[in-house]
Amino acid sequence: MSRPSLTRFLIEEQHAGRIDPELRQLITIVSRACKRISIAVSKGALGGVLGDAGTGNVQGEAQKKLDVLSNDILLEANAWGGHLAACASEEMDHSQPVPDQYPSGDFLLLFDPLDGSSNIDVNVSVGTIFSVLRAPKGTEKPGDEHFLQPGTQQVAAGYCIYGPSTMLVLTLGHGTHAFTLEREEGSFLLTQADMRVPEDTAEFAINMSNQRHWEPAMQAYVGDLLAGKDGARGKDFNMRWIASMVADVHRILTRGGIFIYPWDKKDAAKPGKLRLMYEANPMGMLVEQAGGAATTGRERILDIQPTQLHQRVPVFLGSKNEVAEATRYHVEFDKAQG
């Protein structure tokens, strides 16, 4: 029996009344753009797209050539279809409405065009993360303020990981599903329906080099993980860290674990490292739809009301019981501080 294609999956979701035709079209076009990005990534040095672009983004980060190329591919692909009202990207200062010469649709698309791009020159898996919101009714030209919706308002979220195989992981609010790109026919085929994150885990993903900058609750939590079976947790934990959020979260969706990027004192003015709208919200939705959890260490990520397009937050996501345990350390520390 042949595997269903992404196209068939989306049509069946539409026929079941779970999505409308415009959302189906949007996801289809995003998936096509991801195929183009996959081709560019896979060429590596042969494509002349490695290295720095010589520019910086709104975050103050140096852009890679592939950051810029991936951003342009997504903007171009989504400009003319009539399903989109505006786009916002981690690589752009402000949101961008569809050009005047094209029809405007009902949806807002946010994306990190190439997450983990700092690793691209060393051939580590990278990916594209995206989130879809509805444009507020009556909005003719959406601006940044119209994107400031909590993650609970997302109608779809996903990522495409460019690794040994190219995979699209998608949620439309009814489970999380994985599609693998069959390169010969150029189609994404369903390879894992209803992904489930195990509730318990013995793996954690964190950048330990920042340990000296963590707050006490974080120090205590990770200290107990490292103490293993001789400590308060009573079991050994393994650490995994790829430094590419897409790759780390994909592993957690596949076999469980907890991904942590906490607030730290190294840059105390920033509330976190990862972006709420482009990374935390879509990844949080994907993980929750797979039975996991996503918090800031103190509150559910999807409940946060954004105040800025490029807002940052701490991120704890993955296996439900372990995320709850990490959150407990922070809540109890706050109570003890009065």
UniProtKB/Swiss-Prot annotation:
It is an enzyme of class 3 (hydrolase). It comes from the Bacteria. Its main location: cytoplasm. It is found in: Cytoplasm. One of its GO terms (molecular function) is magnesium ion binding. Binds 2 magnesium ions per subunit. GO terms for biological process: fructose 1,6-bisphosphate metabolic process; fructose 6-phosphate metabolic process; fructose metabolic process; gluconeogenesis. Gene3D superfamilies: 3.40.190.80, Fructose-1,6-Bisphosphatase, subunit A, domain 1 (3.30.540.10). Coiled coil: none annotated. Pfam families: FBPase (PF00316), FBPase_C (PF18913). InterPro entries: FBPase_C_dom (IPR044015), FBPase_class-1 (IPR000146), FBPase_N (IPR033391), FBPtase (IPR028343). Keywords: Carbohydrate metabolism, Cytoplasm, Hydrolase, Magnesium, Metal-binding. It catalyses: beta-D-fructose 1,6-bisphosphate + H2O = beta-D-fructose 6-phosphate + phosphate. Mg(2+) 1 binds at residues 90, 112, 114. Its cofactor is Mg(2+). Pathway: Carbohydrate biosynthesis; gluconeogenesis. Its EC number is 3.1.3.11. Substrate binds at residues 115-118, 207, 273. Homotetramer. HAMAP family: FBPase_class1 (MF_01855). Belongs to the FBPase class 1 family. This is Fructose-1,6-bisphosphatase class 1. It comes from Xanthomonas campestris pv. campestris (strain ATCC 33913 / DSM 3586 / NCPPB 528 / LMG 568 / P 25).
